[in-house]
Curated annotation (Swiss-Prot):
Transmembrane spans: none
Annotated segments matching region Disordered: 232-258
The family this protein is said to belong to: Belongs to the methyltransferase superfamily. RsmJ family.
Protein name stated in the entry: Ribosomal RNA small subunit methyltransferase J
Enzyme Commission number, as recorded: 2.1.1.242
Provenance organism: Pseudomonas putida (strain GB-1)
GO molecular function: rRNA (guanine-N2-)-methyltransferase activity
Chief place where the protein resides: cytoplasm
């Protein structure tokens, strides 16, 4: 895995965004000019995005809670009946407080927030956290989506350390979706994964993540896994909910009540 700050540059997509690009470069401690960079953090009219560079590179990755996939899932995603809702314990009169300790681009957290859950998100990779921060800021300006992202609070840093040092009321549910070691050689791997993997690597500390989550959550821990992946080393889940490509392993501690 590349170290943060190597092979990545920041660039403005047009002159009017030069000041914003310079501010992000300073904050992320990345150069504005690096001809040998493998990735570019780009600032433009659509906000912040990461673009892998090179002839075979997929399109840019950005966070958009207002349009596209997030909007479609919000309108047609199945509401309280979808598997993630059942996994975290959403039921009539029950909207648990959820900590998503592996936030990524915030897609799952947004779904849960749209169903009424108060969400705290932790993202450890600074570039992905920056995309998330930018996407949340743009979404707050939208009349419909602003109320949803108002239920999403972003923290950055190492989730294990943050959970171990947690102060205040613990989250009722902790949701984990660790990056699973990659075995799919097909060309159809999602562009997010193609961009993320060199930046993030695999979550080899998943057992420690689970251990910290089980120590902190007051009611349950939910782990999302590829359907055929082994469970995380450690305590066994009580049961699982299985979909076409994913599985939710449930580790209950206490019943969620209305």
């Amino acid at each position: 895995m590349e170290e943060q700050g190597t092979g990545i540059r920041v660039e403005a997509l047009s002159a009017e965004f030069a000041a914003q690009a310079a501010a992000w470069a300073e904050r992320l401690e990345l150069p504005l000019h690096d001809e040998a960079a493998d990735f570019a953090v780009q600032v433009g009219a659509d906000g912040l995005q990461i673009q892998q560079l090179g002839p075979q590179a997929p399109g840019p990755v950005r966070v958009d809670f207002v349009e596209g996939q997030a909007a479609h899932r919000r309108q047609f995603g199945g509401g309280n009946g979808q598997m993630i809702a059942k996994a975290v314990g959403i039921a009539q009169g029950v909207r648990p407080q959820v900590l998503d300790a592996t936030a990524g681009l915030g897609k799952d957290a947004f779904v849960l927030a749209s169903l009424g859950c108060q969400m705290t998100l932790i993202e450890r990779q600074p570039l992905i956290a920056a995309l998330l921060e930018d996407g949340l800021a743009r979404a707050r300006a939208d009349e419909e989506v602003g109320a949803i992202v108002g239920r999403m609070r972003l923290l950055t840093g190492n989730a294990i350390e943050r959970m171990r040092a947690w102060e205040g009321e613990p989250p009722q549910v902790i949701y984990l979706d660790p990056m699973f070691p990659h075995r799919d050689k097909s060309a159809l791997v999602k562009k997010e994964m193609r961009v993320f993997r060199p930046l993030v690597g695999d979550d080899l500390d998943a057992p420690a993540l689970l251990e910290a989550a089980l120590a902190l959550a007051s009611h349950r821990v939910v782990v999302k896994r590829p359907r055929k992946a082994p469970i995380i080393d450690g305590p066994k889940p009580s049961h699982s909910l299985e979909g076409k490509s994913s599985r939710y392993d449930i580790y209950p501690k206490k019943a969620l009540k209305a």
